[in-house]
A protein has these predicted regions:
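Start-transfer (signal-anchor) and selected internal transmembrane alpha helices
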Residues: 1-48, 127, 250-251, 255-256, ...
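Intrinsically disordered, low-complexity terminal tails and inter-domain linkers enriched
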Residues: 7-18, 138-152
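Transmembrane signal-anchor helices characteristic of membrane glycosylation enzymes that use polyprenol
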Residues: 30-65, 257-273
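Membrane-interface coil-to-helix junctions
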Residues: 40-126, 161-184, 288-320
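Membrane-embedded helix bundles of polyisoprenyl
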Residues: 42, 118-136, 152-240, 251-271, ...
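Periplasmic/ER-lumenal interhelical loops and adjacent helix-loop junctions
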Residues: 67-68, 72-80, 248, 256-344
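A broad structural signal for alpha-helix termini and local helix breaks/kinks
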Residues: 106, 136-137, 147, 218
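Aromatic-residue-lined binding/catalytic grooves and analogous aromatic/hydrophobic interfacial grooves
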Residues: 244
Length: 346
């Protein structure tokens, strides 16, 4: 639902009875917002411990990305013991493997390649929220005058930064950053779903499939959970009669076909791994461990991943968890609570 009561793609050139040409401040312009998002995504990471690597994902991404990609083409790994079925390696064929391979070819320092990778994931999330809100019509209607127009533009920036910099990223950013890809792709998926509902053709469904190809492949459960967003969006669009059920069915079928077409390669790989590989989930995390951490209060403040709370002889497995379980605890609950109260008051 757009801010002016209308859903869907809107004509940004539509004005009221007394059109006024507005020159918004730099930070409330679309281009200015993008620069802010990009700066906050990249600059802090580049100045955070330059020259040092975080133990992120697969060590071979930094040691020998070419060999990792070469071996990822086969589900059988004879180098381990007497041979075994690989674990998630096939998912590194795109996009993480090629990125680190290219960085290695051009001679980029590993720490810099890692920071640019993480910054790109964060930037994709923030820019995705900005694009989603503009797709829904935020900032397109100037009828309310300068104050309303700039208020909506500022709201877009705040929403983008709140999503991009949420505590959720602390769970994965320096250990399993590849799991953040579905999170970064969610706002883009929602925007493409809305556009697929409003237009006829395969363009937006095809882009949806390519996006799913990019953000999926390593962790199927993360992608499936994120996929609930577009599904709920389709159902809600039909229930509130924003579009006909025929449109909903058509868009859903096109998106489903595109998703299966681009994702079948890694789905088959994960099925082979589940049937013949090591029972990794039974050895690392079980349902009890996961559910004990994923409580409603922790999910409310954007956390809840079991690994975030781990402790060892050398201290916390993830250092920021110490702050979020001590002095930052009240603040981490207060901010989302204030956001909900503000949304209810609008």
């Amino acid at each position: 639902m757009g801010p002016n009561g209308h859903r869907g793609l809107q004509d940004s050139g539509r004005h009221g009875a007394f059109p006024v040409k507005v020159s918004p401040p730099r930070l409330t312009s679309s281009t200015g917002q993008r620069w802010v998002i990009l700066a906050l995504a990249y600059v802090p990471l580049l100045f955070n411990d330059p020259g040092r690597l975080a133990a992120d994902t697969k060590a071979y991404l930094y040691l020998d990305p070419g060999r990792l990609m070469e071996r990822a083409t086969s589900m059988w790994q004879p180098e381990v013991a007497m041979g075994t079925v690989t674990h998630q390696n096939i998912g590194y064929l795109w996009p993480m493997g090629p990125y680190y391979w290219l960085a290695d070819v051009v001679g980029m320092p590993d720490w810099l390649a890692q920071r640019l990778w993480l910054g790109t994931v964060l930037a994709a999330a923030g820019l995705g929220v900005q694009w989603l809100l503009r797709t829904l019509g935020w900032g397109a209607d100037r009828q309310g005058g300068w104050l309303k127009a700039n208020g909506l533009q500022g709201g877009i920036l705040v929403a983008s930064l709140a999503y991009m910099l949420s505590p959720y990223i602390l769970n994965y950013v320096d250990r399993h950053s590849v799991i953040l890809l579905p999170w970064a792709g969610l706002p883009w998926m929602l925007g493409l779903t809305e556009r697929a509902l409003r237009t006829i053709g395969w363009r937006h469904a095809a882009i949806f499939g390519l996006l799913a190809l990019t953000v999926g492949g390593v962790n199927a459960s993360s992608l499936l959970l994120v996929g609930l967003g577009p599904m709920v969006w389709l159902l809600w669009s039909g229930l509130e009669r924003a579009v006909s059920w025929r449109r909903v069915l058509g868009a859903g079928l096109r998106i489903g076909v595109a998703f299966l077409t681009t994702g079948l390669w890694w789905m088959i790989g994960l099925a082979v791994q589940a049937g013949h590989g090591l029972p990794t989930l039974h050895l690392t995390e079980n349902y009890r461990v996961v559910s004990d951490a994923a409580t409603a209060p922790e999910l409310f403040r954007g956390l809840g991943y079991w690994y975030f709370y781990g402790q060892g002889r050398l201290g916390a497995w993830i250092e920021p968890s110490t702050s979020y379980t001590r002095w930052a605890l009240p603040l981490s609950f207060a901010l989302p609570l204030l956001a909900l109260l503000g949304a209810a008051a609008v």
